[in-house]
Amino acid sequence: MPRASPTTKLDPRQVLTGAVLRASALLEITQSGLAQILGLSPSTVSRMANGTYTLDVQKKEWELGALFVRLFRSLDALIGSNDPAARGWLNAQNRGLVGRPIDLIRSTEGLVRVVQYLDSARGRI
């Protein structure tokens, strides 16, 4: 894998957009599901996947994308890079959250709750 040289300036929009797309792929979240999570249209997420749209740092989609990546990273740290287990956790009923995380993260409030839940679980290990 090529490494960026110290003088290479990475575009934060491309970095976050790529991280969001990779996390959604590993968690097997559809483009329409990702659109709901980010508050975007399915066609905008399709353009993201095609590389013709990047998340806008001035819009809410940026914050939601950053939260989604944080959710993925927290879940990855807790489960140990076991993608099938992460998908299972995301799709299973969770008593602590009173719902399935995959359903909850489709709203801003639910996404924040799931991230806080994972953060608190990480704090215990």
Locate each region found by the language model.
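Non-transmembrane "mature" sequence context
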Residues: 1-125
